[in-house]
Amino acid sequence: MLVHPQFDPVAIAVGPVAVRWYGLMYLLAFVLFVVLGRAHARRRPELGWNAQAIDDLLLYGVLGVIIGGRLGEVLFYQPGYYLSHPAEILAVWKGGMSFHGGFLGVLVAMWLYGQRSGRGFWQITDFIAPLVPTGLAAGRIGNFINGELWGRPASPDLPWAMIFPWVDALPRHPSQLYQAAGEGLLLFAIVWVFAAKPRPLRAVSAVFLIGYGSLRFVAEFFRTPDPGIFSDLVPGLSTAQWLCVPMVVVGLALLKHAAHARARG
């Protein structure tokens, strides 16, 4: 049975300046976005993206992720706590970022970028969809290093079951790593390959929505659920699972629309 290594959350400390692993994982996510974005632009030159446009996308995306992710954590998961401690809302370095909030923040940011650049919203989301999952993987690895978002109790016979000593002595699923592998690496492989060929408008975005929503919904059964505003709607389903449902529904609707558009030619 494995035991969590209890990493020091600070990766580098020089005097009073400390760089945390969680921040480095965000930096890695942003670097991967640029590297993959340029590779995607090279393999699909007809899409009309260049290095400057990708850098602009990153700037808008970073703002959307940070602002939306934090607001999502505040509104979806801990509204009572943050109403009592409003100064903590700005303490993003302590963790506490909601994917679904960050996702909505990025959508708003991409719409704003589209207004400035003259590009269509779905043209933008279809381009960035293959670039996002590796960043999600990096974020989940950051969660694992931080020792947060641990899994539900697991059978002691499970070879990779892990004890998180600061929680209890029970073997648990390392759900952060499940999510890094699933909604990170597996989803990246699916969307990256799908986006390699010309697709109808909205189709790549649809595959991302369906893939992420489905994989996250399943992963939540292995992760200790976070208390949230939808936690009590149906026993056994978490707030994150409820937030994944509209992602899948919208994704299916977009895929159907894209298929009809292709059929009409």
Curated annotation (Swiss-Prot):
This is Phosphatidylglycerol--prolipoprotein diacylglyceryl transferase. GO terms for cellular component: plasma membrane. It is a multi-pass membrane protein. It is found in: Cell inner membrane. The chain crosses the membrane at residues 17-37, 57-77, 89-109, 127-147, 176-196, 201-218, 233-253. One of its GO terms (biological process) is lipoprotein biosynthetic process. Coiled coil: none annotated. It is an enzyme of class 2 (transferase).
